[in-house]
Swiss-Prot record:
SUPFAM superfamilies: DNA repair protein MutS, domain I, DNA repair protein MutS, domain II, DNA repair protein MutS, domain III, P-loop containing nucleoside triphosphate hydrolases
A Gene Ontology biological process term: mismatch repair
GO molecular function: ATP binding; ATP-dependent DNA damage sensor activity; damaged DNA binding; mismatched DNA binding
InterPro entries: DNA_mismatch_repair_MutS, DNA_mismatch_repair_MutS-lik_N, DNA_mismatch_repair_MutS/MSH, DNA_mismatch_repair_MutS_C, DNA_mismatch_repair_MutS_clamp, DNA_mismatch_repair_MutS_core, DNA_mismatch_repair_MutS_N, DNA_mismatch_repair_MutS_sf
Annotated GO CC locations: cytosol
Tree of life domain: Bacteria
Function: This protein is involved in the repair of mismatches in DNA. It is possible that it carries out the mismatch recognition step. This protein has a weak ATPase activity.
Sequence similarity: Belongs to the DNA mismatch repair MutS family.
Pfam family, one: MutS_V
Protein name in the entry: DNA mismatch repair protein MutS
This protein's UniProt keywords: ATP-binding, DNA damage, DNA repair, DNA-binding, Nucleotide-binding
Name of the coding gene: mutS
HAMAP family assigned to the protein according to its UniProt record, in alphabetical order: MutS
Length: 864
């Protein structure tokens, strides 16, 4: 494809410019009602999509290959291309054709790329890879997790199996170890990598001895874990399993940490799923909170951020320190200085684990060398700004002597494996240099010997060679073999040649082979000694990697706050959530139109909001954004709002949407009630609770009764900070009956038969549900909508009569409705009249003129 744009039409010149920006992917170029592809893209798409390949005039004197797909059907074509491993740039018209001079302005608005396939044999770069052991004793459940790629060793004790199930769902271990007599094995049904282990591996005394040996201690009191006896049993099992499988020392596993529920804002499995933190409801990673927040430049930073998202902390001092660092990095404009340096650090955490396991390859050591080289510049650009940042920088340390060691020891670009040799740099070891010089000198010696022997024997076909089986040899063609001197000893006969050895060559062969073998052996020895030289400072380097991970996360959050217009939230020790101009962090990134920001105000005197409004009005988005903003505040991030004050939170619960759990034999309603039961049992006055459409999976009476009772329990008993979305308008009378309850609604406007969703939150209850208008938007047949309107009018009339008769404060719509008095409503398909029946019975082709006339009179009579 030529790039001399002056030879092309203006439209094709525009296309070629856009294509040059996206050279390696297909470009869907919007032209009217079609997406067009040109040149090689057209040929490729035509073959992949089985669409026609045509030509579009000429440009630069040559016909232009072209293919196209209708814009309204583009998603199907995109899906096929993505499934074939192709990526597509979608180019839209953004200018106005009516006012454009020349081609309409266009730009690439999105790039559709295929999802990545996860190979179980490969380590997921930006996800933790954990082995976990679970244990239960006297009703106390525990889990111990070990990340072999970092040495991170955590234990937790939990009150029940539901809490353990939630923890497993958060961690998603690659392997789960459990005792042969584990009593709650049913919670493991949906996991892979299950390993039943003998009960003795979970014995407490065995575990304590094993852990003390690993850490080189006489007591575990220094780690603060000695009282978590059930968790220690699990820790002993997982450490035993690690040692059993690795069959080597594990020096990078040098501590153990007890995670307390009181330290974190707890999220159950349903909440993690509904909020789409790191995985969307379809199982992918697109359009999740992590997808928006995670622009970390190191894999280890990305993994740390995901841990923060799944385990927000309640330590306000630590949160404020994180905020201070984010604030400082923004104000001091250090983001663009630090991120390139951090990017060069790479995955130092996992490299160090491989060093500890002595499995690091030569290129791991060159990457470690590169990482260590960045540390002085990182420290220089991050220190002397705030006390919090200085404390973090202090953990990075100085490893200049180790960097110098690796600089001297390893060549710039080593081979993949040490066994290939050529890894240790020249000048690092004198003995190695001597052996290498001897090996390298073999070529010149053999050339000289070949010339000398050829001249001495007069055999012009004589040459010296080498193979792995016979070593060095002198080869002479069969035609001249009779000229071989007596001291030539035959070593091998070939079809066209004879191979010989002479004492001088044999002596040199032994010397060279010894040199090569000695060189490889010495190089391997020196390489292993490098691990010994690195190991004394392994713990310090691990601390540095942890600090660099945190700096990467905080620099990333500073960049996100700056790019996405986030603000610093404040914390209050009082109950409540006060957000002004709040936005959904994910939805605002995928919407083409501006996101409608909304407030929320909850406190001890106003702790339950009944949220009403139409379907598609934004109730679920509104509730999720409140939870996500609160969660973001509790990881130390800035938040998408004009301002936000978040009170003390201990848990976040969501009951949003539901589907059948066929694997467990549970219906949609059963899933819904199970989640609701968990909330009612576990929620406290400091919990944030989001309830969306409870009671839909059963009869109207049951559903309304359950919804009413749940709302009343949350308002009176737990007094949790609650948003309760519902289409049961009877619940809007709760504020008049219960303290701390208020109504809000998502606004909408109806004009004739259409509806406009305003997506703005207003005080008070919605006036109506707009269900019929939404049904019409969904394409429900007009006759069905008309019938529904008739039924609705009748039911509303009955409701009004019932209210007047019984003075029912709840305004029951259906309770006590006498449907037996329903007037006859025009059915969808009316019965045929006698006239229609007669007309339908006539076959004009079979009638004589007289019969046709008689039929006409008969029809006229029926009309009368």
């Amino acid at each position: 494809m030529t790039q001399d744009l002056s030879k092309h039409t203006p439209m094709m010149a525009q296309y070629l410019q856009l294509k040059a920006q996206n050279p390696d992917i297909l470009l869907f170029y919007r032209m009217g009602d079609f997406y067009e592809l040109f040149y090689d893209d057209a040929k490729k798409a035509a073959a992949l999509l089985d669409i026609s390949l045509t030509k579009r005039g000429a440009s630069a004197g040559e016909p232009i290959p072209m293919a196209g797909v209708p814009y309204h059907a583009v998603e199907g074509y995109l899906a096929k291309l993505v499934s074939l491993g192709e990526s597509v740039a979608i180019c839209e018209q953004i200018g106005d054709p009516a006012t454009s001079k020349g081609p309409v302005e266009r730009k690439v608005v999105r790039i559709v790329t295929p999802g990545t396939v996860s190979d179980e044999a490969l380590l997921p770069e930006r996800q933790d890879n954990l082995v976990a052991a679970i244990y239960e004793e006297k009703g106390v459940f525990a889990i111990a997790t070990l990340d072999m790629t970092s040495g991170r060793f955590l234990i937790t004790e939990l009150p029940n199996k539901e809490a353990l199930a939630a923890e497993l769902q958060r961690l998603l271990p690659a392997e789960i170890l459990y005792a042969e007599d584990f009593s709650a094995a049913e919670i493991l049904n949906n996991y892979k990598g299950l390993r039943r282990r003998p009960v003795w591996e979970f014995e407490l005394v065995t575990a304590i001895n094993l852990l003390n040996r690993q850490f080189g201690t006489q007591s575990l009191a220094g780690f603060g874990v000695e009282k978590a006896v059930v968790a220690l049993c699990a820790a002993g099992c997982v450490l035993h399993y690690a040692q059993e499988t690795q069959r080597t020392a594990l020096p990078h596993i040098n501590s153990i940490h007890l995670a307390q529920n009181s330290d974190t804002v707890l999220l159950d499995a349903a909440t993690r799923r509904n909020l789409e933190l790191t995985q969307n409801l379809a199982g992918g990673t697109e359009n999740t909170l992590a997808a928006v927040l995670d622009k970390c430049v190191t894999p280890m930073g990305s993994r740390l951020l995901k841990r923060w998202i799944h385990q927000p902390i309640r330590d306000l001092e630590k949160l404020k320190k994180r905020q201070d660092i984010i604030d400082t990095l923004q104000k001091e404009q250090r983001i663009e200085l630090l991120q390139p340096l951090l990017q060069n650090v790479g995955d130092m955490e996992r490299i160090l684990a491989r060093v500890a396991l002595r499995s690091a390859r030569p290129r791991d050591l060159t990457r470690l060398r590169t990482a260590l080289a960045q540390l002085p510049d990182i420290a220089k650009n991050a220190k002397n700004l705030t006390a919090s940042l200085d404390a973090l920088v202090a953990q990075i340390g100085d490893f200049s002597e180790l960097h110098a060691l690796l600089e001297r020891a390893i060549i710039e670009t080593p081979p993949q494996l040490i066994r290939d040799g050529g890894v240790i740099a020249e000048g690092y070891n004198a003995e190695l240099d001597e052996w290498r010089e001897l090996s390298a000198g073999a070529t010149q010696y053999l050339e000289n010997l070949e010339i000398r022997e050829r001249e001495a024997t007069g055999i012009d076909t004589l040459k010296i060679g080498f193979n792995a089986v016979h070593g060095y040899y002198i080869q002479i063609s069969q035609g001249q073999a009779h000229k071989a001197p007596m001291h030539y000893v035959r070593r091998q006969t070939l079809k066209n040649a004879e191979r010989y050895i002479i004492p001088e060559l044999k002596t040199y062969e032994d010397k060279v082979l010894k040199a090569k073998g000695a060189s490889l052996a010495l190089e391997k020895q020196l390489y292993d000694e490098l691990f010994d030289l690195l190991m004394p400072r392994l713990g310090e380097m691990q601390l540095a990697a942890m600090a660099l991970s945190e700096l990467d996360v905080l620099t990333n959050l500073a960049e996100r706050a700056e790019s996405l217009n986030y603000v610093r939230p404040t914390f209050s020790l009082q109950r409540g959530v006060n957000i002004k101009g709040g936005r959904h962090p994910v939805v605002e990134q995928v919407l083409k139109d501006p996101f409608i920001a909304n407030p929320v105000f909850l406190n001890a005197q106003r702790h339950l909001l009944v949220v009403t409004g139409p379907n598609m009005g934004g109730k679920s988005t509104y509730m999720r954004q409140i939870a996500l903003i609160s969660l973001m505040a509790y990881i130390g991030s800035f938040v998408p709002a004009d301002s936000a004050e978040i009170g003390a939170l201990d848990r976040i619960f969501t009951r949003i949407g539901a589907s059948d759990d066929l694997a467990s034999g549970r219906s949609t309603f059963m899933v819904e009630m199970t989640e609701m039961a968990n909330i009612l049992h576990q929620a406290t006055e400091n919990s944030l609770v989001l309830i969306d459409e409870i009671g839909r999976g059963t009869s109207t009476y049951d559903g309304l009764s359950l919804a009413w009772a749940c709302a009343e329990w949350l308002a009176k008993k737990t007094q949790s900070l609650t948003l309760f979305a519902t289409h049961y308008f009877e619940l809007t009378s709760l504020p008049s009956q219960l303290k701390g309850v208020a109504n809000v609604h998502l606004d909408a406007r109806e004009h004739q038969d259409s509806i406009v969703f305003m997506h703005s939150v207003q005080e008070g209850a919605a006036s109506k549900s707009y269900g019929l208008a939404v049904a019409a938007l969904a394409g429900v047949p007009k006759q069905v909508i008309q019938l529904a309107k008739q039924r609705l009018a009748h039911l509303e009339e009955i409701s009004l009569q019932t209210k007047e008769a019984h003075d029912n404060p709840q305004g029951d719509l259906l309770f006590a409705a006498d449907l037996q008095e329903t007037p006859q409503i025009q059915p969808l398909v009316a019965q045929q009249s006698e006239l229609e029946k007669a007309l339908m019975s006539i076959d004009p082709d079979e009638l004589t003129p007289r019969q046709a006339l008689e039929a006409l009179y008969r029809l006229k009579k029926l009309m009368a």
